Amino acid sequence: MIELCGLKKSFSGKLALNDINLFIQEGEIFGVIGKSGAGKSTLLRCINILEKPDEGEVVIDGQNLMSLSRKDLALARHKIAMIFQHFNLLNSKTVFDNIALPMRIQGIDEESIKQKIEELLPVVELTDKKDAFPSQLSGGQKQRVAIARALSCSPKVLLCDEATSALDPATTDAILSLLKKINELYGITIVLITHEMDVVKRICQRLSVMVDGKIVETTALSNIFNKPESLARKMLYAQISPELPTCLTRRLADYATEKPLVRLFFQGEEATVPFISQTSRELNMDINILLANIDRFDGVTCGVLVVELTANPLLLEAFINRCEQAGITVEVLGYVLPDGL
């Protein structure tokens, strides 16, 4: 559906995109994640040639956009919609007129425009806001208008540029649910860029990680746990791992005591097995659970535990071996000193 081949883009001699090669399947929700300045927005803008790449090919639905005339490119863009962090609504126009704008620019007749908007308003849950102005809407409602406007010309591709980063958590959840519904309802291919792993894990089937203008990893979310060195996996674990309280970190030493502090990452079936209680009995060791969190994405349950063990080096080694045999990732954070030292 979308194929990027050897894409390069530079600004003032500095590479923003460096040899990007990527294939996005028709009908999937694909995430691109990375820190600010990684090149995510530039990549997205190159997909619809808002930024023209210096080198490479952008093939959408079998058509190389880089080789099209200006007129043919304008026609091809009718099937590529885009929403942004900022909603870009016309404040002097009603919800109806904001959604109608792209269709009017294309010369679609008013009766067809009315029918399309009446179809879209229930989808974005704005049936009662047709005559409202942007100043009368919440941030989430404004983004819903922007989404309806993007869908008005029946695109095959929807590009989302940090579309939830200006929204509160509850509204973000609602917008992500809406995007997922749109994907299921219309079969639209969605490309979503973000710096938040939580957004990716909520709705994406596959993702790419960008670092300094390069794609360093592309994977299905369900395969993350099979790749111990996966950067995406590390980003996920960092998100779900509870932060250690100061009262604990100030008591940690890097030399061995008989109170090792260990972080455990579970996934899949391992997250539902009573591993801690079984191991405590079998190794005859005390295991004190200090922090825990569990989450679920793409049908996979994953969790993290921070535990304090009562174990000498040999017993700690036996514990780590048991974890590894069970498919549990282990990280020794340090050794707990007695309180007051």
From Swiss-Prot:
**Catalysed reaction, written as an equation:** L-methionine(out) + ATP + H2O = L-methionine(in) + ADP + phosphate + H(+); D-methionine(out) + ATP + H2O = D-methionine(in) + ADP + phosphate + H(+)
Q: Name one GO molecular function term.
A: ATP hydrolysis activity
- So what EC number does this one have? 7.4.2.11
Residue sites binding ATP per the record: G34, K35, S36, G37, A38, G39, K40, S41
Q: What InterPro entries does the record tag this protein with?
A: AAA+_ATPase, ABC_transporter-like_ATP-bd, ABC_transporter-like_CS, ACT-like_dom_sf, MetN_ABC, MetN_ABC_transporter-like, NIL_domain, P-loop_NTPase
UniProt xrefs under Pfam families: ABC_tran (PF00005), NIL (PF09383)
Keyword ATP-binding assigned to the entry: answer is: yes
Please tell me one Gene Ontology term that the record gives under cellular component: plasma membrane
What keywords are assigned to this protein? Amino-acid transport, ATP-binding, Cell inner membrane, Cell membrane, Membrane, Nucleotide-binding, Translocase, Transport
Compartments where located: Cell inner membrane
Residue ranges of the ABC transporter domain?
A: 2-237
Complex and partners: The complex is composed of two ATP-binding proteins (MetN), two transmembrane proteins (MetI) and a solute-binding protein (MetQ).
Provide the family line. Belongs to the ABC transporter superfamily. Methionine importer (TC 3.A.1.24) family.
Record function comment: Part of the ABC transporter complex MetNIQ involved in methionine import. Responsible for energy coupling to the transport system.
What's the protein name?
Answer: Methionine import ATP-binding protein MetN
Question: What is the scientific name of the source organism?
Answer: Legionella pneumophila subsp. pneumophila (strain Philadelphia 1 / ATCC 33152 / DSM 7513)
Q: What is the lineage of its organism?
A: Bacteria, Pseudomonadati, Pseudomonadota, Gammaproteobacteria, Legionellales
The gene for this chain is metN
